[in-house]
Amino acid sequence: MSSEEKIEETQQQQQESVPVKELLLKVQLPSFFNVGDDYLTIPSSYEENIADLKQALNIIVLCRNLTNYSILIKGIDIIENFGELITFEQIISHFELDKQEEQEEQGQEREISELKIVIKEKSYNLASIYEQISRFREVIGLHYIDRLSNDIGSCGGVSKFNGIQLDDIKPKEAKKEESTEKEQQEKEELSISKEEVSKISDFAKQFISDSFDGNDFTKLTKFDDINGKVKIPIKSLTISQWSPVPPFQQAKGDLLYLSLQTLEHETFNITCHFSGFFVNKSSTINFNPTIKINEKGKFNKSYLLYDLVCQLSPLFSKTIAENEINLSDSTKYPETYLLPGNSFPAYPWLVNEKDLQNVPDLSRSQLSSLINGVDGADYIKDWNNDIQSIKELPTTTVQERIIREKLIQKSLFEFNKTATETAINIIKGNIPPLNPDESSDKFIYLRNGIFYSSGTSTVNGFENTGGEEASRYVASKDLTGIKLINRHDIRGISSLVTCIVDYMGKRVVCQAPVPGILDTPVITSPTTDAEGKNEAEEPESEPVEKVVYGLSSDGSRILEDKSFEEPLKQIGDFFHLKPHKVQLSSSSSGDDVKTESNLVVSKDTKGLKGTDGRKYVIDLYRTTPRDIEFIEQHFKLDDDHQETSYPHGEALIRHEAVNEWWRRKVAVLFKKETEQLEKEGKLLDKNQDQDQENKPQIAIPTDQVVFNPDAFSSDNENEIEQDREEVREISKFIKEKLIEEFLDEIKDQVIPFDGQQLTDVLHRSGINMRYLGYVAERLVVKKEKHLVDLEELIKENEAKAEKKREEEKEKEEKEATESEDKKEKKEDKEDAEKEEAEAEEEVPTKATYQLTLANYSTLHRIIIQEMISRSVKHILRNLTKSLPSYLISTAIAHFHNCLFGGAINPTPKVDFIDEIYKNFCSKSDLESFIKLTHDDVIKLVSKEVFSRFRYKLSSNWINTIQLPQLFREIAFKYGIQWKSQNYPFTKEEFELQNNQNKETPTQIQIIETKSSKKSKKKTQTQVITEKSIQRSSIFIADDIIGFIPIIKDSSYKSTIVEEIYSNARSHLVQGNKEMGMALFNELLAINESIYGKVNPETAKFYNLVAQVYQELGYDIEAALIGRKAVILCERSCGFDSYDTITAYMNSAYYESSNEQYLNSLKLYKEAMNTWSLVYGKDHPTLINTLTNLSESLLKIKAYDSALELLQEALEITKKLNGEISEITGFIYYRIANIVVTLNKFKESKELFDKAYDIFMKLLGPDDSMTKQVAKYVSSVGLYVEYLKRQQQQQQQETQKKSKTKTKAAPVNNIATTSTSTTKNGKKSKKNNTPPQSNPEIANQSIDEILRFIEGKPSGSKKSNKKK
């Protein structure tokens, strides 16, 4: 089903769905809550279920500690009898609550609005005791500490938003509907106090490039510390030393014993009983689990653990109340501290040491006992069955689809989390393999229901196409295929739940295995053949083949189970695969093996039958064709090219490229069929009626637009040539179409900030990253051609201008011979004709203001940086794959010294490796990185770049690259977390920093081996000594905080959210604003329920909704949601990700729309600081941003600040685009307008001259923009001359009348000093009359100027009338 069909189906489901019936739940709580006869009221609906009620109870403060209870309706336990997924509508129907008693016989129904529910506590068992303890830990905040301690990285989910200190969102002042002409003209001028304007102007001065914090790592990593203000309300709560409960106490109802230490430093021993919790008489040395009663007969017992601790510790309740106050005071946005739901948080590559903390908690080591069940069996899950069962849930209604998507996302994340944690332990050597006799790259593991293998375990299948490199590559492509099948929701065939973990240079592929695939086949009772031999006793029995469709495990047969054809055909249709026959050449017998019928997928895609009865598909990497053009050109197996060959021959084309090729081919077929019908006269005009039944259907033969996935996958000469040509056509399509179109479009696009954004942009365009070198080369060609074209254009326009000047000169000479009266009449006539012509039609300017040159240069720089950082990642992987984990930090630091510190120390030494460490690894492993020098690393990187990207770096590339940005990219690619400090990347910075650090040198501990001199026998002892070191290069091993795993998983973007979003947008487009906004509000809740609050998808969706709100004029709502989007992007995508930068920019725009300009400037400043870290201080986007900011400042008449921003934008654009560019000319023109407002007419004349010169050269003398600027040049020039003459005249009069003061005309504004004389109603042409210039040119916005230039009417001006 196509996406359009799914959207239509969703719309139909929403239209068919009954309006939501509201329901009020009146919940009676257990008596120990002491609420009397009062009911707890919870708003709900008929569609919600018991699980939703339990979730609501978990949130409500009064009853959030309740975990072990029954839900009774009419005295019947609902969960026990019906389960948690039963809806209230089903409950009402089952109990016939909707029928009136007096009308039961007639069967008449009524809609009830209230439902009474009774919550009854249950007796505890050990499992529910564990659940109660877990809930207690969560309520008091220990789950925050648990996450920090057990996280896969440091400081996950940081944010800086609260540190910006924005003012509260305020509604705009209501504007009158009716306004006078003067108000209409001044609508852009806002009523803001002088004090606020002064604050805004002062803050705007920070927008010069020198003030950006891009290279100040310490400033940029000052993250919010919200959780640090939360105190733990107890000292500790642990499972007591007296646990487990002995048999003689089990019969008395004891379940577990706890030890509690309060903030008052008291220790209590607690018995967990089936009836609740109570303090017992045990101590550290005496066991007595009976209830403790003091001399007054008082004892402490409660059904809830939380209530018991409240009784025992007054500071407990007080601290929890203070925590709530501290959280609310610290931030207005709960998104800042909420824990991520169905995703990992973003882990920063720079970590502030002050944020690293470890809180003491004795119970943390006992968590596995609490959360994995009473016998630990809950840790082992049947992931495959759980997730496949969820996928098989019904999807007939929108609500069912939402529930299904929610469960899928939750289960997939739990799988990814478990798999990642185990993979890290595997890489660290903490888990033994199942096959220890094999080589380490062949190790396999089976742990907690997940099968683990290295990314190179299938290397034997790719001996001829790259071995290990090919194996790693196809593992990622297999995951991509799984992800697409999951998203498309193909039924009848199941894919494996998969994720890939790269950690410290090693890869682990994690999969939930096909049920039964790892089982050893059971041999049945032996049978006897005709000769009396026992068949089961044959010494060499063949292994049981688990594959039933596709290539067999040993590659000798092709299996064709007919039951797999139909479900696999769905996959073939989705990926546009061509049914085809396959022929193999058998190595043993020499006979060819052929398929009997067509395979609907690649032979390498295998079908298996699980013991659960499901059909499974594996090895989905061959769902796109091989990039045969690239492979043939760059992958060479011979010895001569081995050093320079591309690493593997399994290069595959991206699905986006195949889909684009398919769409274009289908469009050609559609056009052809349409033309054929038109030719036959079967297509009638739109105005003619035609029966729907007789209406001609255009049948597009899409089965013609397919490809053979096995083409070029072997040396078989029997492959059909047409199949090969189709694959070759798709391969050529990338270079000939996709890359060229991408480069043509990039002139108008926002250039990526970093490598991750570049990767996403190229992938969306269907371009593989191996083409980076080719794209870089094409950019150079495009840039050179642009410069040549620009030079020719300038020459052409200069020639036109010269010709026009000559024509005007001739005309002036001719007019000089005419009489003055004739000349004046002729001028009046020409002016009238000119004004009439301009009024009738004004040709829009040809100016596009494209940042072509800047975009080409910027993109080229990012591509070079990306190629280098990716190459370094592969070098580091090879360098560290055989090193023990404790030496990897040392190796990484030394490599970075060699790479970045060439100017500081070209031959850095690896110092301070403890002697004892050296005994744990081989000498060859140590020497693999110890002997590296700067020159070695530069050569390694250059070689790797050429090998992987077919691009030759310049010999001095290290001097042309931006080192801080490359440093960041490498950290992301490999997964390194560095200590946040300002690293010196130049010799000057290094020497300055070393001189500053002489007083506080770095202290490190070294284990040294020393010989004893006192003893006669020479004995060696190891001693720990602390040494002060002075850095000899940039980095040391201690600068590395840790490593984080790079995780690729099979989770996908929910389709139901996208479909409802498209439906909501369509309602808005059709003018149904109320329905559209209702759907958007509902969508926010749906999105959060599926993904969780802190999730990248939720963050991006908040951005979308804020944009929609702003478009509809809901500025306050847009500003609020925009702020939340920033926080969620920071915490889930990364504080310096391009998503976060975009969110900051959007949020700044929403604040500006809400007329809170100081807030807007603060957000823009944070965005610029971040992208100066990510890219540098000269990204092309900065030009537009500064220009737009100047517009905002002009609205509040902060002219000086607006001028400073435009001057900064001018310097950047001159650097990036050159002096002669449209955008440079436009900024000159804009600055000149502001300078006029500041009464600096001489300076404005110079600026207008520069703008005119640029536009004349680029647009020609006849362009409307050139003419417009020419008018300003003439107007301001004449006025400057007028002022000069007036000043001279005043001086002469002063000299003549030295005793008399003469009043001079004020020169504060062009409008007040300009006068005009008329003769017979006509303008006088006398030289001593100042020109009539436009007094509002400085107050016009850029959009208004452009509208005026393009001939469009402006709302703030009257149209010119012919005099």
Swiss-Prot record:
Subcellular location field: Cytoplasm
Pfam family of the protein (one): eIF3_p135
Keywords assigned: Cytoplasm, Repeat, TPR repeat
Biased composition (Polar residues): 1330-1342
Compositional bias segments (type: Acidic residues): 833-842
Function according to Swiss-Prot or TrEMBL: mRNA-binding protein involved in proper cytoplasmic distribution of mitochondria.
Subunit description: May associate with the eukaryotic translation initiation factor 3 (eIF-3) complex.
Organism: Candida albicans (strain SC5314 / ATCC MYA-2876) (Yeast)
InterPro entries the UniProt entry points to: CLU-central, CLU_dom, CLU_N, CLU_prot, GSKIP_dom_sf, TPR-like_helical_dom_sf, TPR_rpt
Main location: cytoplasm
Residue ranges constituting the Clu domain according to the UniProt record: 361-631
TPR repeats: 29-63, 120-154, 283-316, 548-581, 1057-1090, 1141-1174, 1183-1216, 1225-1258
Name of the featured protein: Clustered mitochondria protein homolog
Entry-linked HAMAP family: CLU
Annotated segments matching region Disordered: 172-191, 521-544, 799-844, 1291-1363
